[in-house]
A protein has these predicted regions:
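N-terminal, membrane-interfacial amphipathic/helix-forming hydrophobic leader that caps
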Residues: 1-110
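Transmembrane helix-loop-helix hairpins at the membrane interface
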Residues: 1-6, 10-26, 137-262
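Membrane-interface helix-boundary motifs at transmembrane edges
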Residues: 33-45, 113-122, 183-190
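Alpha-helical transmembrane segments of MFS and MFS-like solute carriers/permeases
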Residues: 49-57, 128-133, 165-166, 183, ...
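Juxtamembrane helix-loop-helix connectors linking adjacent transmembrane helices
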Residues: 66-95, 100-171, 213, 220
Length: 262
């Protein structure tokens, strides 16, 4: 089993981090991305406050996932997840609550939105890079899975539209918390690459309770989360190259949406 896990991790690392990283690098050069950098007063102190806020939000997310797991334990899971406006609104409100420690800390520290990657800086370039990455990943997965075009066409319905909005809410919320808030502060404190690696690992492992809520065993959930690290790294690298959460946010949305179409 572990041989398969290591092999899959290697394939994902090659696909996302080597090939994907090279694509992001050259797209940033071609589009002439402008780099402003991020400056925080007292980087160590700011990073520690960011860690505390993100830890609180992560604990809240974990608690919600555990409750969801307990609630679903006595129910027969549907093979097809349905989405609608109510689910999207509920997701948005839930994430607003889950992000409250980060938003409150940001307010207390008087940090601007720009210091979390939320600005019009490299706006068009970020949208384009995020869309290109998302489309390439979507096409690659479709080809690899051998799913017929007719099946995908059939799945492009109203449910898929609401699913896209729902994944956009979750994707951008996660990117704001981990990439825009935590990663930027860690980069300012411990350096660009260390900040990227630490944030990517933390974000990937945060999905363990989510996977368990979906019915995986603890061992399966850990393996699934570890296999998310390459994807997490490329999203973090995309944030570094664009300095805007739009690019990783769009990519994240498409990546999560793929399964709805297959």
């Amino acid at each position: 089993m572990w041989v398969n896990v290591v092999t899959e991790f290697g394939v994902k690392f090659l696909s996302f981090n080597i090939l994907g990283g090279a694509l992001v690098y050259y797209l940033a050069k071609i589009l002439q991305i402008k780099y402003h950098g991020f400056e925080t007063s007292n980087p160590k102190k700011s990073a520690l406050y960011a860690i505390a806020a993100v830890t609180m939000s992560t604990c809240m997310i974990t608690g919600l996932m555990i409750l969801s797991n307990l609630n679903n334990a006595s129910q027969v899971a549907s093979s097809v997840q349905t989405y609608n406006l109510g689910i999207v609104i509920n997701s948005a409100l839930s994430w607003l609550i889950l992000l409250s420690p980060v938003l409150i800390m940001k307010k207390i520290r008087k940090e601007t939105w720009a210091t979390t990657g939320v600005s019009n800086h490299n706006l068009k370039e970020s949208i384009l890079i995020g869309a290109i990455l998302g489309i390439i990943t979507l096409v690659s997965v479709i080809i690899y899975s051998s799913t017929s075009i007719s099946v995908i066409r059939g799945n492009l319905n109203l449910n898929a539209f609401w699913a896209l909005l729902n994944f956009a809410v979750a994707g951008f919320a996660e990117e704001f918390m981990y990439r825009g808030y935590l990663q930027i502060h860690l980069m300012e404190w411990i350096g660009k690459w260390k900040g990227l690696i630490v944030t990517s690992i933390v974000m990937a492992l945060m999905h363990i309770p989510q996977r368990m809520a979906f019915g995986l065993s603890p061992n399966e959930a850990i393996i699934s989360a570890v296999l998310l690290i390459p994807m997490s790294l490329i999203m973090g690298y995309t944030m570094i190259k664009t300095e805007n959460i739009l690019a990783p946010g769009i990519y994240h949305t498409f990546y999560n949406w793929i399964n709805v179409l297959l």
